[in-house]
UniProtKB/Swiss-Prot annotation:
Protein name per UniProt: Queuine tRNA-ribosyltransferase
Pathway involvement of the protein, from the record: tRNA modification; tRNA-queuosine biosynthesis
Residues the entry annotates as binding Zn(2+): C305, C307, C310, H336
Family in the record: Belongs to the queuine tRNA-ribosyltransferase family.
Natural source organism: Borrelia garinii subsp. bavariensis (strain ATCC BAA-2496 / DSM 23469 / PBi) (Borreliella bavariensis)
Swiss-Prot/TrEMBL catalytic activity: 7-aminomethyl-7-carbaguanine + guanosine(34) in tRNA = 7-aminomethyl-7-carbaguanosine(34) in tRNA + guanine
């Protein structure tokens, strides 16, 4: 299922691959986020051209719209979307728990209020697994509690215990999955920013021996040094033979940090989100195309990029589209940023294979260390 081809000599970075039901996925792997089964503003053909073999979709959003019954009538998420590569489906736990006042947690699940129409719903670990089984997801993520940075120890302990119990329920459902379903379950470790809780969570999850393992609940607003502390601590406790996934990271410097510590898979909406505000990823840092200096700039955004924007249009034209709030500008910028992320991952793989990852990381971080990805 998972094989490591090369371990970097100077870090825990590694190159490998996952064999999934809809094809091989090379690692390290950046997953584009297609919340509702598609990336905002991008055709599947763009991702296919990039040889993207794994996309993330979200169970919470698909449950609310179009609904499980609709997707079931189509024979699953792949048929519904016509995406013939792999889907990892998130449980929707992060979205549910982001609702704060609109949800209520108990030991068996979570009751929440739809952000669409105000109707009430109840998610259980078993129910969330069953939905993803209907989707035909290639990687299933369990219902968990992603707790906020800054909560006290007692609250973090409670949420960690609930997450572990839900993982056990999900794993039981996975062991009793429908005949013929061959998707993989990646269980999620939690523990907030308390090392003893992290250690206990990881040990409890490892006892279940799921095919893959994820680190949840980091990159949730904490200082970068706390992110790095828990990332390093958690990764060192994880077995090397399992694929590792850090949920919700997608900025270049966070990805480089994760790969350095042996993480194989990551996802984030950030590249597409910042594109909608006119921020473009380049080898020299972020280009904020709305700035006046680009008004009459006839050059391309970046050389050696094969996206539609860089092969046809100028910086000045893109600035005009973004300033005018034209949808076409957002589409061009989004495609560029996704192209950039895939080129970056390709360069990282090459660096690891050549035992040059540390030099690559050091050089790259000089350009991106101080960037503000929220602009």
């Amino acid at each position: 299922m998972f094989s490591v081809i090369k371990n970097d000599k100077h870090s825990n970075a590694r190159v490998g691959f996952l064999n999934l039901p809809h094809g091989r996925v090379d690692t390290p792997c950046f997953m584009p986020v297609g919340t509702l089964g598609a990336m905002k503003g991008l055709k599947h053909s763009v991702l296919e051209k990039l040889k993207c073999n794994l996309m993330l979709a979200n169970t919470y959003h698909l449950y609310l719209r179009p609904g499980i019954k609709t997707i079931e009538k189509y024979g699953g998420l792949h048929n519904f979307t016509t995406w013939n590569k792999n889907f990892l489906t998130d449980s929707g736990g992060f979205q549910v728990f982001s609702l704060s006042s609109l949800r209520k947690i108990d030991l068996k699940g979570v009751r929440f209020k739809s952000h669409l129409d105000g109707s009430y719903h109840y998610f259980t670990p078993e129910g969330v697994f069953a939905m993803q089984e209907i989707f035909g997801s290639d990687i299933i993520m369990p219902l968990d509690i992603c707790s906020s940075y800054g909560i006290d120890y007692n609250e973090a302990n409670l949420y960690t215990n609930i997450t572990t119990n839900w993982a056990r329920s999900t794993f039981k459902a996975y062991k009793n999955r429908k005949e013929g379903y061959n998707g993989l379950l990646f269980l999620i470790t939690q523990g907030n920013f308390f090392k003893d809780l992290r250690k206990r969570s990881i040990n409890d999850i490892l006892e279940l021996d799921s095919p893959g393992i994820a680190i949840g609940g980091i990159s949730v607003g904490e200082p970068r040094e706390k992110y790095l502390e828990i990332l390093e601590y958690s990764s060192l406790l994880m077995p090397k033979e399992k694929p590792r996934y850090v949920m919700g990271i997608g900025t270049p410097h966070y990805i480089l940090d994760a790969i350095y510590h042996g993480i194989d898979i990551f996802d984030c909406v950030n590249p597409a989100r910042i594109a909608r505000h006119g921020s473009l990823l380049t080898d020299n840092g972020i280009m904020r195309i709305s700035r006046k200096e680009y008004k009459d700039d006839t050059s391309q955004v970046e050389k050696n990029c094969g996206c539609t924007l860089c092969t046809r249009y100028s910086r000045g034209y893109l600035r005009h589209l973004i300033k005018s709030k034209e949808l076409f500008g957002i589409i061009l910028a989004s495609e560029h940023n996704i192209y950039y992320m895939f080129r970056l991952i390709s360069k990282i793989r090459t660096a690891i294979l050549n035992d040059n990852f540390l030099n690559f990381r050091t050089s790259y971080l000089k350009k991106y260390e101080e960037e503000n990805f929220d602009e």
